[in-house]
Amino acid sequence: MHEPRAVVVVHRDVWAYQQAWEQQLAWVQAIHEGQRQDTLILLEHMPVYTLGKRATRADVLRQDIPAVYTDRGGQVTYHGPGQLVVYVLWNLRGQLHGVRAHVARLEEMVMEVLAHYGVVGQRDGAGPGIWVGDAKIASIGVRVTQGVTLHGLSLNRDPDLSHFQGIIPCGQVGRPVTSLAALGVAVSRQALEQRMVEAFERQFNARCWEAS
């Protein structure tokens, strides 16, 4: 077992999607150049639909929430208050595992956190993400640039689930979306973030420290 990798943890309150994306790109460049440690960002977004590389505008059914094309994999999803977003800026160079293993670790993180609250999460052959029964509770989308990952996962804590009705989530018509709150689990954002950081440390063999 290698020594744990030091990772800086950054918490943001509610961040505009475009601002968060631009910050990721800047930090990825710094990581690539050896000027910054790998970084874990935990935040919530203002309401936005994000379209991955396989998405089309036809996947967005509502016009009252902004839609942004992104460079991540996947199709379309919703981000907004009550949903924990975790961006993982992780240098893959020198690693034995590639992008698929990285995505699998993100999924394991989510399932570990859900299990702590007595919720059984599972993978689905339809694509990356985690489901509870037939309802999706977490989405995952990743891009690698200059050997460093960006984007990551979103876990529905207590968002307005009606906003998911304005899209065809991840291209899957008719499949429901759920949240911890809808499953009867009441958890604060702060507590959920702490659980997610701990799960990240275990799944990625990392040692996290909080940015001031």
UniProtKB/Swiss-Prot annotation:
Pfam families, per the entry: LplA-B_cat
Location (main, coarse): cytoplasm
Cellular-component GO terms for this entry: cytoplasm
Pathway(s): Protein modification; protein lipoylation via endogenous pathway; protein N(6)-(lipoyl)lysine from octanoyl-[acyl-carrier-protein]: step 1/2
Keywords carried by this UniProt record: Acyltransferase, Cytoplasm, Transferase
Location of the active site: C170 (acyl-thioester intermediate)
E.C. number(s) listed in UniProt: 2.3.1.181
Top EC class, one word: transferase
Single Gene Ontology BP annotation: protein modification process
Disulfide bonds: none
Domain of life of the source: Bacteria
Site entry (Lowers pKa of active site Cys), positions: K136
Compartments it resides in: Cytoplasm
Reaction equations catalysed: octanoyl-[ACP] + L-lysyl-[protein] = N(6)-octanoyl-L-lysyl-[protein] + holo-[ACP] + H(+)
Record NCBIfam families: lipB, PRK14345.1
Note: In the reaction, the free carboxyl group of octanoic acid is attached via an amide linkage to the epsilon-amino group of a specific lysine residue of lipoyl domains of lipoate-dependent enzymes.
Matching PANTHER family: LIPOYLTRANSFERASE 2, MITOCHONDRIAL-RELATED, OCTANOYLTRANSFERASE
Protein name as catalogued: Octanoyltransferase
Annotated source species: Magnetococcus marinus (strain ATCC BAA-1437 / JCM 17883 / MC-1)
Name of encoding gene: lipB
